[in-house]
Amino acid sequence: MTTSKPRKPSKAKAAKAAKAAKAALEKISKPLSKTPPPFRNHIIDKKALKNLVAWSFKHHGTAVTSSMADDLKDLGFKYATQAAVSISVDDLKVPAAKKDLLGQAEEQITATEERYRLGEITEVERHTKVIDTWTETNERLVDAVKKNFDENAPLNSVWMMANSGARGNMSQVRQLVGMRGLMANPQGEIIDLPIRTNFREGLTVTEYVISSYGARKGLVDTALRTADSGYLTRRLVDVAQDVIVREDDCGTMRHIVVEAEDSKFAKRLVGRLTAAQVVSAEGEVLAERDTEIDPALSSKIEKAGITAVSIRSPLTCEANRSVCRKCYGWALAHNELVDLGEAVGIIAAQSIGEPGTQLTMRTFHTGGVSTAESGVVRSKVAGDVEFGSKARVRPYRTPHGVEAQQAEVDFTLTIKPSGKGRPQKIDITLGSLLFVDNGQAIESDVTVVQIAAGAVQKSVEKATKDVICDLAGQVHYEDKIQPREVTDRQGNITLKAQRLGRMWVLAGDVYNLPPNALPVVDGKSTVTEGQVLAEASQRSEFGGDVRLRDSIGDSREVQIVTTAMTLKDFKLLEESNHSGELWNLEAKDGTRYRLNTIPGSKIGNGEVIAELADDRFRTGTGGLVKFAPGLAIKKARSAKNGYEVNKGGTLLWVPQETHEINKDISLLMITDGQWIEAGTEVVKDIFSQTAGVVTVTQKNDILREIIVRGGDLRLISDNKALERFEGDGQMVNPGDDVAKGVSVDTMKFVQTVETPEGKGLLLRPVEEYTIPNEAQLPELSHLKQANGPHLGIKATQRLAFKDNELIKSVEGVELLKTQLLLETFDTTPQMTVDVERAPDKRAKTISRLRLVILESILVRRDTMSDSSHGSTHTDLQVEDGISVKAGDVVATTQILCKQEGVVQLPEATEAEPVRRLIVERPEDTTTISTSGKPSVAVGDRVVDGDLLASGQPSDCCGEVEAVDGSSVTLRLGRPYMVSPDSLLHVRDGDLVQRGDGLALLVFERQKTGDIVQGLPRIEELLEARRPRDSAILCRKPGTVEIKQGEDDDSLSVNVIESDDAIGEYPILLGRNVMVNDGQQVTAGELLTDGPINPHELLECFFEDFRSRKPLMDAAQEAIANLQHRLVTEVQNVYKSQGVSIDDKHIEVIVRQMTSKVRVEDAGDTTLLPGELIELRQVEDTNQAMAITGGAPSEFTPVLLGITKASLNTDSFISAASFQETTRVLTEAAIEGKSDWLRGLKENVIIGRLIPAGTGFSGFEEELQKEAGPHPDILSEDPAGYRRMQNLRPDYTVDMPPAASSSALLADPSDADLEATRTRHNIDPSASTNAAFTRPDVDNELKEEQVVDAEAVEGLQEEGLLSDD
């Protein structure tokens, strides 16, 4: 510290000071010199760095840590600069072991393929084995990569970065220098062709394409993920936003138990408070109730071997609508007990929502089950295997197709050595797989058993895979498949295999026969190349004239004209105008018909061919249609084509002009009711066509329509007459009186109108149109065939409008149309009529319209291309222009044999004619000569390696066709293994082509983590979705009894409960039972596999506890069990993706989901049945009932998903701002709800301070407690919140340090007092003024002090003293 003018000290003083300083320095540095800082010579990687920073933060606080982190950063950069770690292609060193590893994998896979080819394993087993082999190889390769770098290049830059955790990870290094590995296709199934190369060696084209599948998937995933994750966070924030720490201690005795995983608690206890004493096995008390558990205490508890600790948790906190400090524990931001007013709900929501982006969306289905060689025990000695007397085993086939035995009970297996030595004992657990038989002699180091890990029954799903045929031929089953017919609910018959067995396809050349082809050769006959095997013919159905069209592509069209009709009375004329060509029909009398169809098009029955262009029925403007009595129309389904006239008569037409405007009213240029002349501008740029009275229709200052009605306007005062014609108006016949002195001589339509001059009658002219009974048309001929379809034309009159219809239009309309319609009889629905233009037979210049019905026959050209059809040869049997009768052959097609051989025909039945035939060619058989007498018989089927004679194995697969003394003739074939319950697509003896499906294998594969993983799984849990096909849960505890149903498929599980009642649970097909006979089960336990329905689980728990406990306790325990389940499930998803979230965050959210109950029976309370209400509220209500003696309410706990919970909060403002705004606000308004503004969201929306942090109302009590002599400074605050800035500037309130939340209010300093005195002109020397002198310790005034009235007034003005 320096002063402005240092004085020179005396020498003695200086010496003394120096000595003292030296002593002080020694005093400080002595401990340092004795204990030098620990020198640790370790590699500091990412993990060690993490721990170092955490330790520093805990012991030395933020400032020291941040400066240390800075120093570390500088250090790192300094050495990184000097080391210059770079990466180049040469750094990617592929381990030499890769070649051998891939070689081994290839060998295993070749062996598997060979087993598949010989029909020893099914397609599924082959696929599973291939994938597992590659997965294992990949893992071994990663180890080789690590070993290679570690031993040969520990300072390799790639390895250093990945190994220290600075950048990249092992899976990326694996792809750079190991192998890229297996990829999934877009459906999520793994492709069994792995990418063997790495990026260093480069990918082949095929590998590149497969590789880009995965990359695309990743990109799409990321895009979807961000959106989903954001929405999840929003819902979480909404459900938890009002959870604020409002109390210090709720005093609850309830708690949750945290159990150690593998005798470790990791971080699960840190930051929690104990709910009871923690006592070690020796009886030593490690912690009292309400002790904060820090890492040291946590590891102490672990070391003491304690496996379960009771801690306080937000789940069991009894604070009303909030959480208390002790139940919440540490705020993880600064590792100290959470402060009052901390918005822990929002923190929880963000903590769970934020890692959402790191979770994957969808997972891959691995083909089959990834059976890592887990728990495999090998023999240590050579000897004989003994199972022992207790052993029970059943045959089992592993997913890789290895025959083994599965243990049904726990027992001990012994291997008795053949020589000296101790026997090897292996403990076999239920469900383990044994690869040896009882009494079998084995060598040492042989796989004996695979021990089942934990629960055997995993969640599995049914999946299917097709077996595709590799060669054409004939199918034969082995007897042991035992196919049986199964009829499903729809009545479809399918064939199912009952046992494991082979299906053989014996080779041959299979010919597909076209429809209607018949074989012309007999079975077992020998055919030569080019011989006709079958013949098909195409026939005409109706007969007629043949037209041959030019061929298109590989087929020719033969058209047979069945019926034709030419309209002789009409000329066909063509006109063209700007919109294209128009065709007209002109009759002899000159009337013209407009053609609706152009020549070359097709039309169907009942369609309009032409319309009469008739101006007699055209009006000048729009108007009103009235039918005179006698005119009748047919009812039409739609008015699109108008209404057909039944009976002629008179049609009356009242013209009026209607302008549809839809413009602003300011453009109107006339007034309503005014009489205007033709040509008047009614609206800007719109002119009236006729004269008459104007009616203006408007709505909301928008002009809709302007109607001009012409006629004779008479202003009269006869009220009776005016009333008579009010509204729609009436028709008046000639000679009738309309009003006094007004009569009409022609028919008029009379209406009352209001004009600016007053009321009057408008006599509107009526036009009459006479409509004939029949359409006037020239004679039209019907054309009939002796048999088959025939044609006709009929004329109809159609009115466009019905009686009393108003036509709003300025232009005129056509009232009546005369149409020519096509009529066809005896046609099939597919038949259409072609419209053609034909020259007249006599005068070539005149064209006529011709209607034709054609039968079209497509004739295939000769094809060589389609191998399965053999070569076909087609002959046309007709020529152009000749006439054929119905049933005549038009073309024949022959199927020719491609290669000599022996024909075999399958059995033909009435229902199923022969569709295929097979020719057994010379190359489909092989003859093997044997040295001795063959040991096989005709009809035996052999595979590679089977003995044909002693010491002579077969080198191919097939069926023995002939045997003589020294040779065996085999018909080549291929076996396919079929697993039980597979669907067989073909029957014994069927012929198949290469590529046909033979069977559908049904197999079970393990569900990869419920398939749903990551975000969708989190969402499913937090929204409490009811899963499809959920598992069957046990309702009451008891003993299991498994029963077979009527047929061997169906099972039922009975649970014998404690009171000997029997709970029956029928099990659906395809469900796996997860319990064993005689097993004890508890409520809520799974009886079958499948996802759990959380709502059902809660019901099971509640029913079970309700039978033994009071309602309140039952509800709390049921909820507690479910809460524990939910927290664990959510944690599991995040853990599986490597994200760590503290339990307490999830607990806060789950607490909000389980806080409500549904009232079932209100009792004497004011609650409503069906109402959702907080458990605490019901508890209070029921306690009040217990005191007054009323009937308490009955309720059941409910689980709400986060969306539902958000919409069911007490605050309607918060709910409405979340979703379904209108519904929430409407309901709140109807119920007259009040919002108490307890949460953060409501206050933000209203615009007040949020009740968290310093705005939290709990602060005021703290302040009041500490305000000491000046309680009034806190009194006047309109907002009801104690804001810091509201305290007067003369006083300072120190914000409490984070550790304790007690507020301190310092007394005013001398300077402050001085300032206030000066402001109020108070004489400082007058010691009697109590207001500005300091009170004594007890806030009592000394006797000599008197209160100065002026000073008090001044203080009251300042608001520093209350009026009391």
Swiss-Prot record:
Q: Which GO terms describe its molecular function?
A: DNA binding; DNA-directed RNA polymerase activity; zinc ion binding
- Entry keyword Metal-binding: yes
User: What's the top EC group for this one?
Assistant: transferase
Residues the entry annotates as binding Zn(2+): C250, C317, C324, C327
By its UniProt entry, which Pfam families does this protein fall under? RNA_pol_Rpb1_3 (PF04983), RNA_pol_Rpb1_4 (PF05000), RNA_pol_Rpb1_5 (PF04998)
* UniProt KW keywords: DNA-directed RNA polymerase, Metal-binding, Nucleotidyltransferase, Transcription, Transferase, Zinc
The record's region (Disordered) falls at 1318-1342
Q: Does the keyword Zinc apply?
A: yes
Q: Which domain of life does the protein's organism represent? A: Bacteria
* Listed InterPro entries: DNA-dir_RpoC2_beta_pp, DNA-dir_RpoC_beta_prime, RNA_pol_Rpb1_3, RNA_pol_Rpb1_3_sf, RNA_pol_Rpb1_4, RNA_pol_Rpb1_5, Rpb1_funnel_sf
EC number assigned by the record: 2.7.7.6
Q: What is the protein's quaternary organization?
A: In cyanobacteria the RNAP catalytic core is composed of 2 alpha, 1 beta, 1 beta', 1 gamma and 1 omega subunit. When a sigma factor is associated with the core the holoenzyme is formed, which can initiate transcription.
Protein family membership: Belongs to the RNA polymerase beta' chain family. RpoC2 subfamily.
Q: What this chain does, per the record?
A: DNA-dependent RNA polymerase catalyzes the transcription of DNA into RNA using the four ribonucleoside triphosphates as substrates.
> What name does UniProt use for this protein?
DNA-directed RNA polymerase subunit beta'
